[in-house]
């Protein structure tokens, strides 16, 4: 069973990975026609439902751990365009970075990793005082955004995850995984059930008790006068004086009860030489049944001949 569970987890990994990729939001930098995967911050409204576009600015200071200096510019508040702040991870909490950017007049924040790591993380913050859109991108994506940021209106966009595609992939993944698990379970349990069913429905060939009783019997007196030997090959006990033995056509003898039980319950062959006694036993039985008919026919034929001679 552990093998089945391990196989299921191994098969499920690619589906879960693809689902995570489809669930990612994207950052689009229009100036170089590039898009980057990102993870929204963990609070409702972390990325506007219909997406948001605006001008991208590199934060000053870059770590965003103190109020950003852009607000000190004389023309900062006159620009009504949506403003994005690009901030590097580290030195302080995500919540401090977002609050500093928000208080400096930014409507969206892109935080990028400070180490070269492809795994994105979810920024966990207290949503009570935060209203800006916020996403997290990799170090590579952040360095590219930093290089090409121009502060132009509409140059950068945040697109929310495509929920429809995510649910489609989830449904396909679920049913595919269910199908694979079903196949593995069938492959695991079917042979056992087949073996049990076959064992229950396979009938052992046995002799009828009436045929067994037609086999000759004798009383054991001395092993020197009999070919039966001294020990029963079925129960492995020595013969005792006066015990009843049954003799098979192959000239092997056994205790009466032992061989009768063997032939009526377990098989039709001699336990010693495997000689099948069905043919000889049945043929002798048929011969006995046909003998009276033959004698009657012969007597009738003789009577008819004698009548004609008269």
From Swiss-Prot:
Record's protein name: Receptor homology region, transmembrane domain- and RING domain-containing protein 1
Gene name as annotated: RMR1
GO cellular component terms listed in the entry, alphabetical order: endoplasmic reticulum; Golgi membrane; protein storage vacuole membrane
Residues bearing glycans: 75
UniProt biased composition (Polar residues): 294-310
Biased composition (Basic and acidic residues): 284-293
Ranges for region Disordered: 284-310
Zinc fingers, RING-type class: 232-274
UniProt entry keywords in alphabetical sequence: Disulfide bond, Glycoprotein, Golgi apparatus, Membrane, Metal-binding, Protein transport, Receptor, Signal, Transmembrane, Transmembrane helix, Transport, Vacuole, Zinc, Zinc-finger
Pfam families recorded: PA (PF02225), zf-RING_2 (PF13639)
Signal peptide limits: 1-25
């Amino acid at each position: 069973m552990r093998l089945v569970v391990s196989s299921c987890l191994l098969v499920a990994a690619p589906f879960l990975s693809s689902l995570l990729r489809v669930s990612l939001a994207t950052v689009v930098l229009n100036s170089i026609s590039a898009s980057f995967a990102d993870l929204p911050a963990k609070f409702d409204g972390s990325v506007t439902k219909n997406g948001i576009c605006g001008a991208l600015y590199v934060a000053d200071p870059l770590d965003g751990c103190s109020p950003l200096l852009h607000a000190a510019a004389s023309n900062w508040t006159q620009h009504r365009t949506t403003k994005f702040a690009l901030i590097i991870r580290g030195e302080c909490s995500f919540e401090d970075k977002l609050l500093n950017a928000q208080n400096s007049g930014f409507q969206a924040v892109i935080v990028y990793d400070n180490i070269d790591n492809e795994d994105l993380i979810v920024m966990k913050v207290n949503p009570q005082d935060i209203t800006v859109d916020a996403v997290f991108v990799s170090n590579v994506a952040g360095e590219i955004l930093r290089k090409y940021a121009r502060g132009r209106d509409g140059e950068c966009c945040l697109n929310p995850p495509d929920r429809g595609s995510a649910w489609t992939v989830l449904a396909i993944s679920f049913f595919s995984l269910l199908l694979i698990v079903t196949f593995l379970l069938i492959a695991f349990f079917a042979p056992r059930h087949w073996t049990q069913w076959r064992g229950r429905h396979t009938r052992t060939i046995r002799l009828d008790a009436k045929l067994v009783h037609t086999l000759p019997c004798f009383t054991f007196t001395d092993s020197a006068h009999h070919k039966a030997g001294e020990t029963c090959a079925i129960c492995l006990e020595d013969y005792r004086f006066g015990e009843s033995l049954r003799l098979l056509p192959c000239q092997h003898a056994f205790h009466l009860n032992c061989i009768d039980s063997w032939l009526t319950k377990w098989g039709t062959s001699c336990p010693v030489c495997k000689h099948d006694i069905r043919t000889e036993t049945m043929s002798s039985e048929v011969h006995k049944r046909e003998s009276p008919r033959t004698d009657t026919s012969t007597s009738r034929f003789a009577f008819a001949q004698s009548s004609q001679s008269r």
